[in-house]
C-alpha cells in the first residue's frame, strides 16, 4: 500500500491560447468542495448523468478510478467501467456495483515481434468495440485513468465528441495517457510537471486517507517496540517477502518491531514459510482492507513506490522506506518515491541495495522522534482534493 511542487503549463503547437485557457478553467475554485458540488448539482437538469470510467491492469490505475466512480455515484451519476475480460478490474469493479463493459485489448510492451505486428488490427477491433459501448451508453463524460484499455476508449470518446478527462497517477506518464493527452478535454496529474497543459491535483483516493489525525497526535506518547507495516501491494513484493523475515531475525527478540506484513494473495503461503524459517512472529495477511488506518497505526511503512502508495502515505502523513520495483516502466517508482524523499519525507533504498543485515541495522537505529519528523514532512506534500476537483469538472461538463 502511498505528491507536490508547483506545476507549469507548456503551450502546445497548433493550440490556440483560447483553447488552452478553456482547459485550464473550470476545476479551480475558491469555494469548499461541498459548496462547489452543491452549486453544480442545483444547476443541473433532473436527468440522470452517465460517466464511463476507463482504467485497468493494476491497482494503481483501478483504485483511483474506483474513488472517482464512488464519488460520482454519490452525486447521482450512473457509472460504467470499460475494462478487459479476465483482468484485475473485472474482479474488483462489478462487486462494487458498477456495470462492467468489456473490450478485447492488451499491451504489447515486451511481448515480441508477432504481437507488435498484430497491434494495428487488434487496436482497430478494440476501438470498434469501445465505439459501440460509447454509442450505446451516450456518456456525458469519459474518464481515463491509464492502462491499455484507456487508449481505444479515449479514441472512441473523441470520435463521438464526448468530453474526455484523463488522470495520470505516476510521475512518468504511461503510454496511453501520453498519446491521448493532446486529444483530451481536461488532463490531470498526481505529481507536478508530468504532462504539458495538465492540472496537478494529486491522486483520487478514499476519504479515509485524508481524515486521519496528524502524525503528532497519532504518535504522541507511544512507547515500546516500533510498529512496522510491510506492504507488498496488490501483487505482492517477493523481494520484501524474502528479505524482511531474515532482517528481523538479525534483531534481538526484545528489540524487534511489532510487524504486520501484507504479501499479496499469491504469496501468502510462501511468506508464512519464510517467517517460520526465520523464527519470527508477525501478523501476516494477503490484503489490508483499511489501508488508511494501517498507515496511521504504523510508526514505519516499508513498501514499494507505486503512485497510490506514495500519495496515500503523504495524505496520512506516515514515515516510509520506499523500495521501488526495479522493473517498473521507465523506472517510474523511483521518481514517485523521490517526490517525498527529496523533502525529507522518507527513505529510498533500491532493491539491489536491500540486504537483510542492512535492513536490520537500519531498523535498529530508528528513533521515534526521527520517524515523527519524516511523517510530518511527508504530510506537508499531500494534495488531497483530486476527487473533488475532477467530479466538479464532470458536473460542469455535463450541463
UniProtKB/Swiss-Prot annotation:
Pfam families documented for this protein: Glyco_tran_28_C, Glyco_transf_28
InterPro entries: GlcNAc_MurG, Glyco_trans_28_C, GlycoTrans_28_N
GO terms under cellular component: plasma membrane
Keywords: Cell cycle, Cell division, Cell inner membrane, Cell membrane, Cell shape, Cell wall biogenesis/degradation, Glycosyltransferase, Membrane, Peptidoglycan synthesis, Transferase
Tagged with keyword Ribosomal protein: no
Compartment(s) of residence: Cell inner membrane
Transmembrane segment boundaries: none
Main location: membrane
KW Glycosyltransferase (keyword) present: yes
Residues noted as binding UDP-N-acetyl-alpha-D-glucosamine in the record, renumbered to the chain: 58-60, 170, 206, 234, 288, 333
Family statement drawn from the similarity comment of this UniProt entry: Belongs to the glycosyltransferase 28 family. MurG subfamily.
NCBIfam families found in the cross-reference section: murG
Name of this chain's protein: UDP-N-acetylglucosamine--N-acetylmuramyl-(pentapeptide) pyrophosphoryl-undecaprenol N-acetylglucosamine transferase
Organism of provenance: Acidovorax ebreus (strain TPSY)
Higher taxonomy: Bacteria, Pseudomonadati, Pseudomonadota, Betaproteobacteria, Burkholderiales
